[in-house]
Amino acid sequence: NGFQHDLKAVCDLAHDRGALVYADIVHTAGAEPFDVKASGVDFAACSSFKWLMGDFGLGFLYVKESVLPRLTRPVVGYYQAPNLDANYPPNLPTGAYRPVEYSYGPPTAASYFEMGTLTGSAMANLALLSSSLSYVKALGPANIQAHRIPLIRRLQQEVPRFGFVSVTPPDATGGNVSFARKGLADSDVPRRLAAAKVNVRLGRDWMRLSPSVYNDMGDVERFLAALG
């Protein structure tokens, strides 16, 4: 619903009691500035298909360096061996064979969790991310956020006039703004939005909008006109 945790306060509370903190940052990464180290979290992860503008199949995992030695990998794969030297006897000259050399040392980086060859869809997404991440970095998450906030504030101001209740905190600065109205799915709102070619996330009694740099105030006004 757009609520944002004070992660530093959460982490301080958890760490004082010996607990570790995992943060799902899928609605943060790429949508607004976020310093994963300053937040204090021990783990953070996100997909690439939302605000990073990628697709399904790849994601990102952050693990605080001091926590890495405490982890156990569930699956072992050859990407996790930092010095793998594979030799396949059928393709080597006579006498050239030597044993495969490898070492599964202690965890030192993200490769500790990688399992093996990426699937075709993941490879395609990797190519897509090489472009989308450059685009997001060039724009800058702070600029993306600054562009979006006036759009969200306008929505928070106007949508309640149509019988909705805003369930997003009024000072939220994230990428989503949500509204609730009982019986929304059975009303004429979904039909009106579809006719106006306005695409939002609709539930039975709620809807969520996620404006970004590819939207402007004209899009907001078109959405409001479709509601009325």
Feature locations, PLM:
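Pyridoxal 5′-phosphate
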Residues: N1-G228
